[in-house]
Amino acid sequence: MLGLITGSGFDTISELDDAKPEVITTPFADVPITRGFLDGSPVVVLRRHGLGHRIPPHRIDYRANILAIHDAGATSVVATAVSGAIDATLKPGNLVLIDQFIDATHGRLGTFFDDEVRHTDMTEPYDPVLRSIVCQAANETGVPIVNGGTYVCTNGPRFETPAEIRMYQTVGATLVGMTGCPEVTLARELDLPYASIGVISNAAA
């Protein structure tokens, strides 16, 4: 079953049929989700910022969210990531299928392995098979998408300075946001295939 993690600008999915709210209990927090159907296929939707978009990026319980969508039965996850464009060729409304990330956050609880030594392979943090499926679906439906891009995750809630954006440009970053990490890392730790679509909202800084 597909899991959808939505962020800013995606508080509702009008195409979701037979929507039923539910709460998933995890050791970290209780997480509200919505079950429903998209084009006849079952999905589970998790709003990253909580109901009413009330949780800022640095206060999101990423462990609770990823464990909740996993325990709700999702076997793969596609997330949205509203982002600023670092690559000047990207314009508002463009979509980027992210394939790498740079984690510039600090202080976030970003692992399930606090009590054991485990080193998760992050060579391909975004599942290549799932990315291929997303790319194919976009092509078949005529939705333009840039296949590949490096996402910088900053801590928020403030925006980045021009100097920070220039620094990220020098290391090859494509887009910047505040919520992609540690979400992707936690999904990898659970062997949960995860893909993220960067939705460009503005030029960074």
Please give the residue ranges for each predicted region.
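Metabolite-binding pocket within alpha/beta catalytic cores that recognizes anionic/polar moieties
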Residues: 1-123
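Generic hydrophobic/aromatic pocket-lining and core-packing "Φ" positions
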Residues: 66, 165, 181-184
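Non-catalytic positions within long, well-ordered alpha-helices that form the structural scaffold/packing
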Residues: 70-73, 169, 188
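Short acidic/polar active-site loop segments enriched in Thr and Asp
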Residues: 75-76, 174, 193
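Generic non-transmembrane alpha-helical segments
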Residues: 129, 133-144
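Active-site/ligand-binding-proximal alpha/beta "capping" segment
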Residues: 140-174
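Zn-dependent metallopeptidase/amidohydrolase metal-coordination segment
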Residues: 178-205
